[in-house]
Amino acid sequence: MAYPFSTIEPKWQKYWEENKTFKTVEDKNYPKDKRLYILDMFPYPSGDGLHVGHPEGYTATDIYSRFLRMSGYNVLHPMGFDSFGLPAENYAIKTGIHPLITTRKNMETFRKQIKSIGLSYDWDREISTSEESYYKWTQWIFLQLFKKGLAYEKEAPINWCPSCLTGLANEEVKDGKCERCGAQIQRKNLRQWILKITEYAERLLEDLDELDWPESIKIMQKNWIGKSTGAEVDFALVDKDGKETGQKIKVYTTRPDTIFGATYMVLAPEHELVKSITTSNQEKAVAAYIEEAAKKSDLERTDLAKNKTGVFTGAYAINPLTEQKIPVWISDYILISYGTGAIMAVPAHDERDFEFAAQFNLPKIKVVAGAEEWESGKRDFSEEPKACTTEDGYSVNSKQFDGLKTEEAKTKITEHLENLGIAKRAVNYKLRDWIFSRQRYWGEPIPLVHCPSCGIVPLNEHDLPLTLPQVESYAPTGTGESPLAAIDSWVNTKCPKCGKEAKRETNTMPQWAGSCWYYLRFIDPHNNEAFADKEKCDYWMPVDLYVGGTEHAVLHLLYARFWHKVLYDLGLVSTKEPFTRLINQGMITSFAYMRKNKSLVPVDKVKKISETEFEDIETGEKLEQVIAKMSKSLKNVINPDDIIKEYGADTLRLYEMFLGPLEVSKPWNTSGIMGVFRFLEKIWNLSDREIYKTPVNDTSTPETKTLTVLLNKTIKKVTEDTASLNFNTAISQMMIFINEVSKHKKIPHYVWYNFVKLLNPYAPHLAEELWQKMGNDESIAYSHWPMFVEKFCVDQTCTVVVQVNGKLRGKFEAEAGTSKEELERLALSNEGAIRNIEGKEIKKIITVPDKLVNIVVQ
């Protein structure tokens, strides 16, 4: 009989919605260890809707949540939308339609698609970051950051996207290009709001060790934070006669042991001392260089492959340990944002310094000898090195520190510099403060005003939310001002402090702002008095399992950790970290077709010749089938709506989980869906067989014993695999179970009853229908998860090897624990043994219970 998924699935989706089956309340009867918060990274509601990659993570958390509910847990499993962002604004610029209208329309599409997959979210907790009732609290949290001194205004060189016409955080730039649109980034000085994430660098680093996250993500965050230890050293500037001027250049170095090899210094073009130390005859060249450097992104400036450029300032400093006068240069390979924006250049032991010295014919002094070189007895290192060496070794050309190993030399030389009063130990981070403002319309307004008398003043909290005004044009100005700056009626306001004329801040917050804390709003989404009730936060937090893509490693995940720690310091949350466990689902890829020149051909331009042969329809060129990311341009995006229409949501759910382990990327192959559909169809048809009553775990007949053993093994396997998120192997075991059960014309009630429960998290629509078909009035969603009996999970039979004089002659099956005498009898009656002992005298029989019988003959 055909499996009527198109009738069953809407029926149960309607039932769940009308009965609020998955509504969650803070029931204090559940102890803390029986409350679990399972969260998906919420989607941006684009106009394209879902593709089959989205349901992978959503289905995984849904299976796990359904399993946990049946296992006696109170589960919080919500869904919402990260709805501020550039795509909706760009669409508004083209069409004139307000972003809120398109965003709400897109959310409706997403909501409909998500519900059609049968995901057990508590929809009463739905949130949207662009709704005023939500961003009121995003603004409120920003004000707490501002009052705590963690938000400051500064004119700074930023990453400017000439296409999006807005500033970007460092984390939003990939390979010198805008992460969103791919345009080449420019550098531009703009007034910005910046958050002091660097104040939390050490805690963000240390607390990673407490998290059950993929090691690769932790490493990415550690590298981004980039902690290093070293020393800050002062180099005195001198005039042309070698007399100290009173000015000093402070450098940060991780290699104080190499200071004897510092032969010149380099300042970032933006360094505050450049103007004052540049000599008159170098002013023109220095000014031209600074102007050129300002046009480059940090990535361009630090590209290891580019030729080193620079200009001599005309100034000199004194190396404090060699007492030699060394020139001071400026170069764009030094960034003002790292360390002190100045370096002591040691060309013999730093590749960039070596290249710069070679370019400008500056001296190189070797001060570290390799272990092999030193241990060979060589002591003359006066010759200028022809190559740079960066590995540790022994100090040379370093006066009293010669012969010290690198680590000891670092310590001793730092102590010596400290004793001279010109250095101190220091820790540095690559992490930069977060450029928080955007020069766009569709984002949270920053709740501050600029008052001529009072300066920057926060809005009163009772005046939140500060809402976005209606505008005629959503287009960014391109001048660095937000479109909001043109709305005089909105910009002009009264100072909350003195009541005089003032102007609103016109920059808006980045898309990341709303997603920094959304997991907290899910806990208490309708609270008008606080972002979330503290008691409810204590009930649910931290998030026990967070599932999403690796692309958020140093953006959302780092920002959310930062905001959470601020809220923790303010006493507003009780946990130091928001997300205890993180899993990154693998990408679902698709097939693409590649020409010899490595370019890809859209799927609709490909002709399939055979399972392994493909050609370009237009040119006839043979094509290679490859795995690639789904993309609209390649026409290989799969819409889940199409799959659900043809095969059903349960088929989609099972297929995506059956493709392979959750964390591994795997290719979508529509032809593979049919096997999963037939599996569900087989289950449906089995439900029409006779289901008869018999004692639970009946072993009174060979048939019931076989099914009892199979059921208990299946319960154990599916339980363990679901608990460990190994969904593909759990499905495989259920397939084995159904294949065996289908051999039986009638099925014991307890066997079918418990299997339907196992099926429920994976194929909930079908499970609900089968559950009702068995006479149950309530939903299966909160029925008790089946328990297995361990004795039935141990193999009941074993394979016994038969040997004659130590050589394998046969095998037979026997029940585990069969007596020695019975094993010998069975071995002697084995055909292989009979052939090899005929006409011979049996001297002895050696038996290893459950394993082998060796017949010794002569």
UniProtKB/Swiss-Prot annotation:
Pfam families: Anticodon_1, tRNA-synt_1, tRNA-synt_1_2, tRNA-synt_1g. GO terms for cellular component: cytosol. ATP binds at K632. InterPro entries: aa-tRNA-synth_I_CS, aa-tRNA-synth_Ia, Leu-tRNA-ligase, Leu_tRNA-synth_edit, M/V/L/I-tRNA-synth_anticd-bd, Methionyl/Leucyl_tRNA_Synth, Rossmann-like_a/b/a_fold, tRNAsynth_Ia_anticodon-bd. It catalyses: tRNA(Leu) + L-leucine + ATP = L-leucyl-tRNA(Leu) + AMP + diphosphate. It comes from the Bacteria. PROSITE patterns: AA_TRNA_LIGASE_I (PS00178). Keywords: Aminoacyl-tRNA synthetase, ATP-binding, Cytoplasm, Ligase, Nucleotide-binding, Protein biosynthesis. SUPFAM superfamilies: Anticodon-binding domain of a subclass of class I aminoacyl-tRNA synthetases (SSF47323), Nucleotidylyl transferase (SSF52374), ValRS/IleRS/LeuRS editing domain (SSF50677). The keyword Cytoplasm applies. GO terms for molecular function: aminoacyl-tRNA deacylase activity; ATP binding; leucine-tRNA ligase activity. HAMAP family: Leu_tRNA_synth_B. This is Leucine--tRNA ligase. It comes from Treponema denticola (strain ATCC 35405 / DSM 14222 / CIP 103919 / JCM 8153 / KCTC 15104). The lineage of its organism: Bacteria, Pseudomonadati, Spirochaetota, Spirochaetia, Spirochaetales.
